[in-house]
Amino acid sequence: MQDRFVHCIAQLPQPLADQLVPLLNQDFVGHMDAQQVADLAAATQMSQDELLLALLPIAAALAKPPISEFYVGAIAKGASGDIYMGANLELDGEALFHSVHAEQSAISHAWLSGETGIEDIIVNASPCGHCRQFMNELVEGQAIRIHLPEQATQPLSHYLPYAFGPADLNIKTPLLSKQQHEFTLESADPMIIEALDHLSLSYAPYSESYAAVVLETRDGATFCGRYAENAAFNPSMLPMQMALSAMARHNRDFSEINRAVLIESSQGKISLVGATMDALHAVAAVELEHIMVDPV
C-alpha cells in the first residue's frame, strides 16, 4: 500500500479497510471501474452512496495543499459507472489562482479517461462557487447530483440556481461532449504527437484558443492536460494545472519533470504561454517548449 494512504485507511470502517488495502498498491491513482465499485459495496454491505462517501478520505489523501493545509477530496462518478478521484492542488509560494480544486481534479481525471458524462460528484466539503460554476459547464451540468457528508443529496441546480452557463452563450456542445478539432503538424516526436492528440480534444469555445500540455518525467512517463474553458472565464482550467494535477494523483514529484510541451492553436484569441511558464517554473527548472499549430 502507498504510504500516502496509511493514515486515512485507519479512519475507515474495518470491513472497507480490509477490502481496500490490496487495491491501494503502487498503481492506484484514484480510479475504480464500475465492477470494482459494485464488488466493494457488496463485500462491505454498504449502499453505493454510503461507499462513495466513505471513500472520501482516500481521495483527500491525493491532495497537495502546502498553503491551506486543507485536504479536500472529491469523487466523480461517470456515466460508465466508473469513479474518478481528485484532490486539491496548490503551488507552494505561488499565487492562489494556480490552485486546482478537488472537483476540478476529479472531473479532469474523468475527462482525460474518456468519460462523456458525470452523474454524481461526492465531496467532503460544500463546493465553492468556483467549482459550482465549473461543474455547470459540463454536459447536463445542472442535473449532476452533489453528495456531501450528513446532507441530503441535491442536484447542482440546488447549489447554483439561476445559473449562467454555456447555453447562454449558444454553446451546443458543453464540456465532456466529444471534441475533435483538426490541426496540421508534421512531427515524429512521440511527445509532440501526444500533445497534438490532446489539443484536438481540448475545450475552448469562447476564445478558440485550443491548447494542451504534456509533461515528461525522467523515466519517460508522460502526464497530459487539456484546456477546459468556462462560460464565466475565471473558472477555466488551464492545461498545465491539469497535467500537474494528474502527476499529483500518480504520486509523482514535480522535480521529476525533465521536459514540458505546450501546444496551442495559432488562431486563438489568447495565448496560454505566459500562465503556463509561470506554473512550470514554480515547480521545475525546465524550459517550456511552445508550439503553435494551424487549424485545418
UniProtKB/Swiss-Prot annotation:
GO biological process annotation, one example: cytidine deamination
CDD domains: cytidine_deaminase
Function in brief: This enzyme scavenges exogenous and endogenous cytidine and 2'-deoxycytidine for UMP synthesis.
PANTHER family assigned: CYTIDINE DEAMINASE
Catalytic activity as recorded in UniProt: cytidine + H2O + H(+) = uridine + NH4(+); 2'-deoxycytidine + H2O + H(+) = 2'-deoxyuridine + NH4(+)
Binding site for Zn(2+): H101, C128, C131
UniProt GO molecular function: cytidine deaminase activity; identical protein binding; zinc ion binding
Keywords: Hydrolase, Metal-binding, Zinc
Pfam families the UniProt entry points to: dCMP_cyt_deam_1, dCMP_cyt_deam_2
Domain spans labelled CMP/dCMP-type deaminase: 47-167, 186-296
Sequence positions that bind substrate: N88, L89, E90
Assigned protein family: Belongs to the cytidine and deoxycytidylate deaminase family.
Cofactor remark from the record: Binds 1 zinc ion.
HAMAP family found in the cross-reference section: Cyt_deam
Enzyme class, broadest EC rank: hydrolase
Protein name: Cytidine deaminase
Active-site positions on this chain: E103
Swiss-Prot/TrEMBL cofactor(s): Zn(2+)
Enzyme nomenclature, EC number: 3.5.4.5
Record text on subunit structure and interactions: Homodimer.
GO terms under cellular component: cytosol
InterPro entries cross-referenced by the UniProt entry: APOBEC/CMP_deaminase_Zn-bd (IPR016192), CMP_dCMP_dom (IPR002125), Cyd/dCyd_deaminase_Zn-bd (IPR013171), Cyt/Deoxycyt_deaminase (IPR050202), Cytidine_deaminase-like (IPR016193), Cytidine_deaminase_bacteria (IPR020797)
Species of origin: Shewanella loihica (strain ATCC BAA-1088 / PV-4)
